């Protein structure tokens, strides 16, 4: 349901290899002069090949060209790989939305064997 809302409200972009979509993200206008990258994903078979970083650079360039001054992204507290990627791409940790996933998702989420309960919010100035 949340993903459908993102798609309806945002701009959707895909990453392609040999004509096949292997990654995607949605760019949302969330507040004045602020956009957020949501629902970013890369197929597991092609992860760690620079596709996620390329999509994040594309998101930053697209947001900047559209007049946004800030770009935000969020990930779960157990998403250490995602946080490292986002940091390498210029995002900085801003705040933690404690209990976000526990509140908004009926089933517990585990990532790398750890409970994903909090949303780590990150941002970059464009």
Language model: regions and residue ranges:
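Conserved GNAT acetyl-CoA-binding A-motif
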Residues: 63-75, 85
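Acetyl-CoA-dependent GNAT
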Residues: 1-45, 56-57, 125-126
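Conserved active-site tyrosine of GNAT-family acetyltransferases
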Residues: 86, 91
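Conserved beta-strand-loop-alpha-helix junction that forms the acyl-donor binding cleft
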Residues: 73-83, 94, 98-104
């Amino acid at each position: 349901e949340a993903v459908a809302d993102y798609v309806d409200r945002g701009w959707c972009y895909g990453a392609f290899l040999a004509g096949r979509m292997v990654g995607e993200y949605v760019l949302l206008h969330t507040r004045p002069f602020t956009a957020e990258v949501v629902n970013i994903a890369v197929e597991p078979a092609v992860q760690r090949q620079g596709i996620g970083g390329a999509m994040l650079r594309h998101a930053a360039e697209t947001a900047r060209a559209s007049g946004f001054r800030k770009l935000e992204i969020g990930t779960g507290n157990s998403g250490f790989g995602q946080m490292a990627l986002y940091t390498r791409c210029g995002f900085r940790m801003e705040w933690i939305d404690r209990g976000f996933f526990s509140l908004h998702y009926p089933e517990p989420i585990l990532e790398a064997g750890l409970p994903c309960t909090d949303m780590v919010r990150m941002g970059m100035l464009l």
